Amino acid sequence: MPKLKTKSGAKKRFKVTATGKVMSAQRGKRHGMIKRTKKQIRQLRGTRVIFKTDGDNIKKYFLPNA
């Protein structure tokens, strides 16, 4: 069985923590920001932990070596 390669797009978008959780940037910051309040825009900064089931799928299919 050959080694599985990590998907390069996922490598740039996701980070796996030491405890195995998957982190990613907040969604919803590409367009349509004029409708949001300053507080809403500010709260979209930084990263977040992805739900466990989604994180498991990301690790299985896109980040097999993580």
Curated annotation (Swiss-Prot):
Gene Ontology process terms (BP): translation
Molecular function GO terms recorded: structural constituent of ribosome
Record lineage: Bacteria, Pseudomonadati, Pseudomonadota, Alphaproteobacteria, Hyphomicrobiales
Gene3D superfamilies recorded: 4.10.410.60
HAMAP family per the UniProt record, alphabetical: Ribosomal_bL35 (MF_00514)
Residue ranges with Basic residues bias: 27-41
A GO CC term attached to the entry: cytosolic large ribosomal subunit
Region (Disordered): 20-41
PROSITE patterns in alphabetical order: RIBOSOMAL_L35
UniProt protein name: Large ribosomal subunit protein bL35
Family to which this protein belongs: Belongs to the bacterial ribosomal protein bL35 family.
Keyword Ribonucleoprotein: yes
A Pfam family reported for this protein in Swiss-Prot or TrEMBL: Ribosomal_L35p
InterPro entries per the UniProt record, alphabetical: Ribosomal_bL35, Ribosomal_bL35-like, Ribosomal_bL35_CS, Ribosomal_bL35_sf
